Amino acid sequence: MSHINHGRRKWLSLGGIVLGASLLPNTVLAAVSTPKPRLLSFRNINTGEKLSAEFALGRGFNNATLRLLDHLLRDKRTNQVHRMDPNLFTKFYQVQQNLGLRNTEIQIICGYRSATSNAAMHRRSRGVASNSYHIRGQAIDFRIDGIPLAKVRDAVDALQNGGVGFYPRSNFVHMDTGPVRTWRGS
């Protein structure tokens, strides 16, 4: 009789394990398929405006936040707003992860630049490209307070995705979504 009970216990235990295992994939799948919130915080040093928001929802972008970011990154000279490449924000998120940061304020030096503003800057400085990625909404000049500029540059460069300009005297890093390339400015 004890032999039968022992066998019955074994089958009941095995049934419990099988039942538990059948529930596990859904739990694991739910945990894996729910992405972490992708938060970014910005301060435009020219206007003093700040924005801290979730730029992506699930696997896509948060369009309401993208519109706010477009406004924050507008041309400081003309106040013109232009659609920024959302991939820039994914890159910012990856840069913060590379630096071991989480939702740390990113100081914006320059985002979108109208063709008029860019032409005026190009006339004053050889360092401004006549066909800058800023005109297309594909570039941002920035720094992260408290993080050495060279370390920020290295974190952007590690992505091997787009352009990286290093401007130590001007205290900013240029990041864009154009072809992979690097340069050093003043």
Give short role names for the model-derived ranges:
Residues 89-96, 118, 149, 153:
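Extracytoplasmic/secreted envelope proteins and their assembly/folding machinery
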Residues 25-53:
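C-terminal segment of N-terminal export signals and the immediately downstream linker at the start
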Residues 58-109:
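Active-site acidic/histidine clusters and adjacent loop/turn architecture
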Residues 2-3, 38-43, 127-186:
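Catalytic cores and adjacent binding grooves of peptidoglycan-active enzymes
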Residues 44-46, 55-57, 110-112, 144-146, ...:
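A mature extracytoplasmic/lumenal domain signature
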Residues 1-22:
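N-terminal secretory signal peptides and thylakoid transit peptides that target proteins
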Residues 51-56, 184-186:
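Short amphipathic beta-strand/extended segments with alternating polar/hydrophobic composition
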Residues 115-130:
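Charged, often glycine-rich, active-site loop that binds/positions anionic groups
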